[in-house]
């Protein structure tokens, strides 16, 4: 919501009457009945494991997009991203800390946690957009948006491969996070993995194609359907998860240093909206 307000402020302050019209359209738009423009945001988040994996990995895509806009030659846009990046950092920290505590508790089985990683990480790959995108090409040429690693990257830019380039940087970062989660597993547990970048894709060159989630090898239709049933959460898996959360009090490790929220209920609070 706050991101939208900031973009509306830019439209109103710098784009005259047409900017005000576009800002009004943005503020009036509603995304009921799963009509959000990006498919990932139409997927239900209705349990704690969904919430933690979503905020760790989907909001991480938001960090990547905002960081690319931070290098914008349109200074007001570049400056505005700092506040939004701060907000995304809170989201990612919440998700990553939650997943770590789930892994440390060791109650939710590895195979079930892996299914939710496969679900949300593969969906996040799509958020980087189509391959060979003309929009990404011209956004770079016109200085609206840079590469994620722009200040450190001295290589000649591949203008027709920008989205996929940033998508691979995202996967590298996510792979490091998954490896870190593995360091909190109990001895003997099967390691978690980052899904292959071709798996379960709805956008780009791999859209609608059939690949193994871990190895990336091509599969025929029958083998793929069997594999999807094994590596993405089903209604039965969700029922298992909800039963664990309901009946296992220690399904997540207690947060270290956590305070009872009611103990500070009378204290003045700083709203993130005012940062």
Per-region residue spans from a language model:
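Conserved alpha-helical segments that form or flank metal/cofactor-binding pockets of metalloenzymes
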Residues: 1-29, 96-99
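A contiguous pocket-lining binding segment that forms or flanks enzyme active sites
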Residues: 76, 80-138
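Extended, helix-rich structural scaffolds rather than catalytic motifs
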Residues: 111-275
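Internal, conserved structured core segments that host functional sites
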Residues: 43-94
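Polyanion-binding and phosphate-handling cores
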Residues: 68-69, 75-79, 89-105, 153-163, ...
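Acidic/His metal-coordination segments adjacent to aromatic residues that form catalytic metal sites
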Residues: 27-55, 105-106, 120-139
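Domain-scale activation on soluble regions of proteins
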Residues: 10, 35-42, 67-68, 98, ...
């Amino acid at each position: 919501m706050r991101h939208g307000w900031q973009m509306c402020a830019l439209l109103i302050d710098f784009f005259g009457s047409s900017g005000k019209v576009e800002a009004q359209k943005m503020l009036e738009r509603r995304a009921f009945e799963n009509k959000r423009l990006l498919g990932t945001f139409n997927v239900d988040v209705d349990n704690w494991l969904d919430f933690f994996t979503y905020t760790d990995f989907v909001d991480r895509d938001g960090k990547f997009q905002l960081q690319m806009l931070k290098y914008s030659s349109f200074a007001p846009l570049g400056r505005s991203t700092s506040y939004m990046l701060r907000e995304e950092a809170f989201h990612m920290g919440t998700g990553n800390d939650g997943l770590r505590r789930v892994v440390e508790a060791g109650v939710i089985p590895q195979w079930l946690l892996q299914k939710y990683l496969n679900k949300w990480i593969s969906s996040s790959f799509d958020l980087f957009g189509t391959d060979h995108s003309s929009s990404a090409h011209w956004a770079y040429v016109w200085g609206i948006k840079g590469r994620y690693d722009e200040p450190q990257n001295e290589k000649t830019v591949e203008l027709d491969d920008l989205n996929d380039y940033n998508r691979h940087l995202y996967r590298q970062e996510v792979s490091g996070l998954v490896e870190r989660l593995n360091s909190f597993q109990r001895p003997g547990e099967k390691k978690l993995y980052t899904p292959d970048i071709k798996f379960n894709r709805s956008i780009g060159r791999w859209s609608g194609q059939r690949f193994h989630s871990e190895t990336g090898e091509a599969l025929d239709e029958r083998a793929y359907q069997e594999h999807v049933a094994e590596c993405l959460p089903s209604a039965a898996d969700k029922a298992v998860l909800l039963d664990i959360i309901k009946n296992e009090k220690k399904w997540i490790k207690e947060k270290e240093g956590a305070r009872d929220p009611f103990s500070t209920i009378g204290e003045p609070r700083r709203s993130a909206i005012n940062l």
